[in-house]
Amino acid sequence: LSKVETLFEAAPYSHGLFHYGGGVIFGPDGKLYIATGERNFYEHLNPKLPFAQDVSDRRGKIFRLNPDGSIPDDNPNFGSDAVSGLYSLGIRAAQGMTIDTRTGKIWFSEHGTIQGDELNILEAGANYGWPNRTTGGYRTKNYKPAEVEGALYKDPIHFWENTVAPTGLVFYSGTEFPEWRNSFIVPGLSKGSLWRVATENDQVISSEELF
C-alpha cells in the first residue's frame, strides 16, 4: 500500500478486548458507514451517562462519512457537543452490515449481552437503546443505567430469544439457491451456527437455523 490516509479513528484508546470495532460498508448513497463498539463486557464499567448514549463519545455509535472522510451536509444534528460524523447511537456491538437490495436500506446485526441479539434497520438520528433498552439481560448484577432525558429508543426489527452472537451479515439476492433468495444470512459466534432470516416489507416472516 502507498499513500495511506486515515479517515476515521475509533478514539479513545482503551485496554478492552471486546467490541472495539464493528461493521463498515459503503451505502447506496456512496457514503461510508462505520460502526464502533461500546467495548464494555460488564455494564457497570459505564460512567453515569453510558458511553453508547453519550453523543460526545465515539463508542457505541454508527458514523456516516463522505469517501474522503469529510462529513456529509445532510447528516443528522445531535448538537454542538456531538462527535463529528455521528449518524446513530445506542449501539453495543454492530459487527454485521449489509444492504437490502430490494429497498436500498442498510441493515445491521448486533450482539446483546445475555441473549438480546438483534437485527436492525439503520436510520438517521436513531437511538437503538443500549444499554437503557435491551431485549436481553445484563452481565452486571442489579445494573440499572441512568435515564437519558428525552431519549426515544428504536426497537429492533428482530431479536433472538437464545444467544446467537451474530457476526457478519449478508443479504442474498442470487439465483443459485432460490429458496434463500431475498434473505439475510447471519453467522453466529456462540455455536458456530448459520441462520437464514426472511423478510418482507421490513418485517421478519421467518427465521431458521441452517446449521
Predicted feature locations:
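Multi-bladed beta-propeller domains
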Residues: 6-9, 78-79, 210-211
